[in-house]
Regions:
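Divalent-cation
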Residues: 1-218
Length: 218
């Protein structure tokens, strides 16, 4: 059954993944806004050297994977549920326990509640990231959404920034400037800063070397 519908499963996951990940970012930002303190979090590719990026931080002894695992489980259950609505029963080993005797019952009473519970748990993990971001310093995640550190104080060495970004940062505080400087030095990285007034900005270092910044409207 898995081999017959694997491509359908994968395609559903690919289509839903950008929606889910943007939702994760949205929830984290909104939770930071709700605290009225401001905060920052960043995503750094695991392959990127970051030893000189921080002057202080609280590293975990190993990456915390709760958020990453919650994302993967939600992606899996969404694919299973979408296929089930079309009358296809399948699941990767370990996601759901048993084959269904009553297919409609299985869809309504087992798959859908598990998907709902997975989304609730994912929201709680987003809230946890937001809570850590409310501390001074940034939360550091890798691009697989593994949590590496929090309360990270970014080095404030000032690189040569594009004129439009430099002009934008002229009216911003240390949190924005430090994040922009850090992201500009790390190819493929993303940083999000939420101000105390609730406004949010995303900085992104493109693979070509350019850095873009976007006001987030949620």
């Amino acid at each position: 059954m898995w081999e017959s519908h694997k491509n359908d499963y994968v395609n559903i996951a690919k289509d839903y993944c950008p929606v889910l990940l943007s939702g994760v970012i949205r929830v984290i930002v909104r939770e930071i806004q709700r605290a009225d303190h401001g905060g920052a979090f960043m995503f750094i590719p695991s392959s990127v050297q970051r030893n000189d990026l921080f002057r202080d931080k609280r590293w975990y002894s190993e990456n915390r994977l709760e958020l990453s695992q919650a994302i993967h489980r939600t992606l899996a259950l969404n694919s299973i549920y979408r296929l089930a609505l079309k009358g296809t029963w399948m699941y990767p080993k370990g996601v759901l326990p048993t084959a269904p005797d009553d297919f409609p019952y299985w869809v309504e009473r087992i798959v859908y509640p598990q998907l709902t519970n997975s989304c609730i748990y994912l929201t709680k993990q987003c809230q946890r990231i937001a809570h850590l971001a409310n501390a001074d310093g940034a939360v550091v995640l890798n691009t697989s959404f593994g949590l590496e550190a929090f309360s990270a104080k970014l080095n404030s060495d000032i690189p040569t920034l594009p004129a439009d970004l430099a002009s934008f940062l002229g009216s911003k505080g240390n949190r924005h400037n430090s994040m922009a400087n850090a992201i500009s030095a790390l190819p493929g990285s993303i940083g999000v800063v939420v101000s105390q007034d609730g406004s949010a900005v995303c900085f992104h270092r493109l693979s070509e070397g350019d850095i873009e910044f976007i006001d987030l409207t949620l």
